[in-house]
């Protein structure tokens, strides 16, 4: 039988950067941070062939910020309010509640909330993402892989709800996605893709059963392209092996 409780020894937001693999966070020793980051939780119960300990892990950050010394911009207004919970001791009953995940770079803001249940079984997802982000500012505030060049303005407001059994059985009537996404003056270039992919305008409308591509125009290398159309069963397309 297990009965354990824990809490991060300090509330310094640098604790959050420390849990990100160094490949993505780089050297954090000289990163300037403000605000807090706290992880606390408890495990209790029996462990046998059918059970794991019951647990409740809370992850919280309020109005935090961080700035890398060699980059011109900071990530600020960081809010994290997340719980990872299992009340039964049955592994399939594990769920994640992301009540709030948000941050700002300059005046651009990203927001997300989600509920993910039956994490190790028939995973169910109910999520909302909205925000406006100048993608060029990402590399000005956070270390990105060498050779990566990302530009464009992304505006999105999308809701999605689905379960994995419905996706696997192609029962797309049980899924729901709606909202809008617009991407303008997008450019992507990396070491793997040396010829930039450019999208002058992309507008998509998400409906419960279809995605309407209202406008798409761009170029790659010396090739120009444009398109409009409809995608049926987007989630099935995304998760198709």
What are the residue ranges of the model-derived segments?
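Membrane-proximal interfacial segments on either side of biological membranes
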Residues: 1-97, 101, 108-211, 223-241
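Acidic/polar loop patches that form or flank catalytic/metal-binding clefts of enzymes
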Residues: 214
């Amino acid at each position: 039988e297990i009965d354990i409780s824990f809490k991060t020894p300090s509330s310094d937001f640098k604790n959050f950067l420390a849990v990100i693999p160094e490949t993505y966070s780089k050297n954090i020793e000289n990163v300037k941070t403000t605000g807090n980051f706290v992880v606390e939780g408890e495990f209790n119960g029996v462990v046998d062939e059918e059970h794991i300990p019951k647990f409740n892990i809370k992850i919280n950050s309020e109005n935090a910020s961080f700035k890398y010394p060699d980059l011109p911009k900071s990530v600020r207004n960081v809010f994290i309010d997340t719980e990872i919970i299992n009340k039964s001791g049955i592994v399939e009953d594990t769920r994640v509640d992301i009540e709030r995940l948000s941050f700002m770079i300059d005046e651009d803001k990203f927001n997300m909330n989600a509920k993910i249940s039956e994490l190790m079984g028939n995973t169910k997802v109910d999520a909302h993402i909205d925000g406006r982000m100048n993608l060029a500012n990402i590399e000005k505030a956070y270390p990105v892989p060498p050779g990566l060049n990302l530009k464009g303005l992304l505006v999105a407001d999308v809701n999605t709800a689905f379960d994995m059994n419905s996706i696997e059985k192609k029962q797309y009537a049980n899924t729901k996605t709606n909202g809008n996404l617009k991407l303008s003056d997008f450019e992507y270039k990396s070491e793997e893709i040396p010829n930039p992919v450019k999208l002058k305008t992309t507008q998509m409308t998400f409906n419960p059963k279809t995605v309407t591509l209202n406008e798409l125009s761009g170029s790659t290398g010396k090739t120009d392209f444009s398109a409009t159309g409809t995608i049926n069963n987007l989630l099935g397309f995304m998760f198709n092996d």
